């Protein structure tokens, strides 16, 4: 029992380290994007966003390989699903960023890009963290570290007004403060038609 507990704690500590590394990388990219916006180098912003997502994905793969070894490495089918998700996310990001450039003045663009960055760029890491820790560890709710109480501004409207969903796999955020209103990992519903 003690060995199992120690192993779970080790996995928890490892996931915290990898999460901090991912968030630090996102912060670095955020600084780079702010600089690119100031220089109006909008084409390079898309590359920076994609680079951020891809590196988050690579960190998750490295985490699985180093922590659990090749025997417990995700199946090939799961790797293909990850790659498909990467491309889908990139295409979705391109659409969102293009839309941000077409709307409003520079302040509006900066706000929209900032929101996209803080959500979309970490979605791959968050999704991977929950799926991996749910499979290997009982501390998934701790390892994710995504849930928080809504702010006063959100509570005032009961979490129902001025709330936006930014990204398919992410919780709703207030567009101004971007706090998490409510977060419950989404579960894929079984298709009754397929099971019939």
Locations of the language-model features?
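Generic recognition of flexible, low-complexity loop/linker segments
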Residues: 129, 165-168
